[in-house]
């Protein structure tokens, strides 16, 4: 399926239905931020990326990596593609780009969402060939079992298979076990059964941080710069 046939992999800006221009303002701010920063790691995605920046664990684990957070609430794969094609990768040379997006692609099939994520990986590989890409798996959502959980699970299966053996891309299952044995998700982990609480972010971020350090260490062994020290 080509990008022309798959709306999830066709770069598209968000329609400004509210009329305040916030999405484009954030995009322009991210482009400006990239002009005077030298990040080791760039995060891009939807609200799960955006809200991570407000948690103490971001400052503990990711600020020492000089990480930039380019998350915008509500974004789908096609919106991230548009942002990446329009300047958010132009002025930086990160070692790793973390991608977490897809749960908002409500009108798209699991196969289409997978195509959108693959298009993002391909674009990052083309624009930032030195960088590794880490794709975080979509989380389960909803207090009780529902079709969106199954769709996200299927996306994860497809993306994992698509990236298997990829030399510069890695899939990380971000779910530490949010679904309990009775099929429910606790509001202590996801306060609205979609977005993570501070408690919910902790295991996700620690697993991601471990992977990032491992990848950065591998690159350091190949002649990269020394790693920054984590915060105490």
Curated annotation (Swiss-Prot):
Highest taxon of the lineage: Eukaryota
Modified-residue entries (Phosphoserine), positions: 2
EC category name: hydrolase
Protein localization: Cytoplasm
Residue numbers annotated as active site: 47, 192, 195
Activation/inhibition comment: Beta subunit (PAFAH1B1) inhibits the acetylhydrolase activity of the alpha1/alpha1 catalytic homodimer.
Keywords: Acetylation, Cytoplasm, Hydrolase, Lipid degradation, Lipid metabolism, Phosphoprotein
Location of N-acetylserine modifications: 2
GO CC terms: 1-alkyl-2-acetylglycerophosphocholine esterase complex; cytoplasm
EC number of this enzyme: 3.1.1.47
The keyword Acetylation is annotated on this UniProt entry: yes
Catalysis: reaction(s): a 1-O-alkyl-2-acetyl-sn-glycero-3-phosphocholine + H2O = a 1-O-alkyl-sn-glycero-3-phosphocholine + acetate + H(+); 1-O-hexadecyl-2-acetyl-sn-glycero-3-phosphocholine + H2O = 1-O-hexadecyl-sn-glycero-3-phosphocholine + acetate + H(+); 1-O-hexadecyl-2-acetyl-sn-glycero-3-phosphate + H2O = 1-O-hexadecyl-sn-glycero-3-phosphate + acetate + H(+)
Assembly description: Forms a catalytic dimer which is either homodimer (alpha1/alpha1 homodimer) or heterodimer with PAFAH1B2 (alpha1/alpha2 heterodimer). Component of the cytosolic (PAF-AH (I)) heterotetrameric enzyme, which is composed of PAFAH1B1 (beta), PAFAH1B2 (alpha2) and PAFAH1B3 (alpha1) subunits. The catalytic activity of the enzyme resides in the alpha1 (PAFAH1B3) and alpha2 (PAFAH1B2) subunits, whereas the beta subunit (PAFAH1B1) has regulatory activity. Trimer formation is not essential for the catalytic activity. Interacts with VLDLR; this interaction may modulate the Reelin pathway.
PANTHER family: PLATELET-ACTIVATING FACTOR ACETYLHYDROLASE, PLATELET-ACTIVATING FACTOR ACETYLHYDROLASE IB SUBUNIT ALPHA1
Function per UniProt: Alpha1 catalytic subunit of the cytosolic type I platelet-activating factor (PAF) acetylhydrolase (PAF-AH (I)) heterotetrameric enzyme that catalyzes the hydrolyze of the acetyl group at the sn-2 position of PAF and its analogs and modulates the action of PAF. The activity and substrate specificity of PAF-AH (I) are affected by its subunit composition.
Miscellaneous comment: Originally the subunits of the type I platelet-activating factor (PAF) acetylhydrolase was named alpha (PAFAH1B1), beta (PAFAH1B2) and gamma (PAFAH1B3). Now these subunits have been renamed beta (PAFAH1B1), alpha2 (PAFAH1B2) and alpha1 (PAFAH1B3) respectively.
Family, per entry: Belongs to the 'GDSL' lipolytic enzyme family. Platelet-activating factor acetylhydrolase IB beta/gamma subunits subfamily.
Protein name in UniProt: Platelet-activating factor acetylhydrolase IB subunit alpha1
Organism the protein comes from: Bos taurus
């Amino acid at each position: 399926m080509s990008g022309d046939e798959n709306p999830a992999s066709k770069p598209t800006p968000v329609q400004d239905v509210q009329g305040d221009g916030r999405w484009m303002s954030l995009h322009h701010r991210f482009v400006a931020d990239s002009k005077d920063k030298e990040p080791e790691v760039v995060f891009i995605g939807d609200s799960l990326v955006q809200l991570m920046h407000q948690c103490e664990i971001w400052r503990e684990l990711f600020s020492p990596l000089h990480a930039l957070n380019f998350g915008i609430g509500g974004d789908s794969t096609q919106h991230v593609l548009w942002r990446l094609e329009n300047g958010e990768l132009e002025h930086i040379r990160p070692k790793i780009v973390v991608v977490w997006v897809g749960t908002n692609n409500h009108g798209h099939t699991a196969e289409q969402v997978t195509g959108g994520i693959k298009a993002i990986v391909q674009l990052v590989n083309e624009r930032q060939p030195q960088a590794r890409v880490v794709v975080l798996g979509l989380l389960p959502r909803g207090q009780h079992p529902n079709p969106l959980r199954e769709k996200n699970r299927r996306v994860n299966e497809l993306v994992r298979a698509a990236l298997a053996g990829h030399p510069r891309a890695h899939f990380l299952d971000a779910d530490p076990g949010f679904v309990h044995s009775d099929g429910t998700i606790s509001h202590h982990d996801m306060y609205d059964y979609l977005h993570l609480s501070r408690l919910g972010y902790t295991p996700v971020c620690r697993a991601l941080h471990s992977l990032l350090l491992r990848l950065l260490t591998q690159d350091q062994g190949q002649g990269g710069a020394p790693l920054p020290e984590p915060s105490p």
